[in-house]
């Protein structure tokens, strides 16, 4: 089973479990801005919790594949060891991407909490929207359903920013990849890399092919 197939099956399973909870729409513009920010926070936390489950399942699969690499090497079946090692490398690549997404969303949640309590919506949400747009794009081929949900979240936040801009007399918004958004994602990637080193054992050298090193 490939890493993408495993992740797809996990996603379908938990989509059923979370049915009715995860499909909460960002309230329409008639609702107060603060209430809609709270709803956005809830939605982000839900994504973080689901990512925890996905990452846990990927760790389980990683453990199985790692053991198969070792067993194949012990039996001197290097071609099979390389096959398992390549799949293991793919699992870890996806897991790091999920960890980076989770850590970045944790930062988004904190920013939304700050905005909800202290205000200054227009200035503080622009970087958040940039982060969400980048995560949405990066997850399209890995977790399409989460990518779609991030797109919906981004649209809801864009409505909030537009309204906040109207109230403050500011016109025009940009959810581009701002320096602050870039910093959030870069820091998330660094933390994810560190967690990968802590959670996953190094691959046996003989099982690492040129494909894994690239």
From Swiss-Prot:
Residue ranges crossing the lipid bilayer per the database entry: none
Cell cycle in keyword set: yes
Single biological process term from Gene Ontology: cell division
Induction line: Expression is highest in dividing cells.
KO phenotype (gene knockout): Deletion mutant forms small colonies on selective plates. Forms enlarged cells, with a highly elevated content of DNA.
Highest taxon, organism lineage: Archaea
InterPro entries: Cell_Div_Machinery_Comp
Summary of the function given for this chain in its UniProt record: Part of a cell division machinery.
The protein's name: Cell division protein B1
């Amino acid at each position: 089973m490939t890493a993408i197939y495993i992740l797809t099956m996990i996603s379908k399973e938990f989509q059923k479990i979370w049915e009715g909870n995860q499909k909460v729409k960002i309230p329409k513009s008639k609702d107060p801005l603060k209430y809609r920010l709270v709803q956005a926070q809830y939605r982000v936390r839900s994504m973080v919790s689901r990512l925890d489950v996905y990452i846990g399942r990927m760790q389980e699969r990683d453990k199985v594949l790692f053991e198969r690499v070792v067993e194949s090497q012990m039996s001197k079946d290097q071609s099979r060891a390389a096959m398992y090692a390549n799949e293991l490398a793919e699992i870890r690549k996806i897991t790091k991407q999920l960890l980076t997404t989770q850590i970045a969303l944790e930062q988004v949640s904190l920013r939304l909490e700050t905005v909800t309590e202290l205000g200054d919506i227009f200035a503080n949400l622009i970087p958040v929207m940039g982060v969400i747009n980048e995560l949405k794009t990066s997850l399209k081929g890995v977790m399409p359903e989460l990518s779609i949900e991030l797109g919906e979240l981004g649209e809801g936040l864009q409505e909030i920013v537009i309204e906040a801009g109207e109230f403050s007399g500011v016109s025009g918004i940009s959810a581009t990849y701002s320096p602050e958004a870039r910093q959030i994602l870069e820091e998330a990637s660094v933390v994810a890399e560190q967690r990968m080193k802590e959670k996953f054992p190094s691959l046996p050298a003989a099982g690492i092919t040129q494909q894994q090193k690239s």
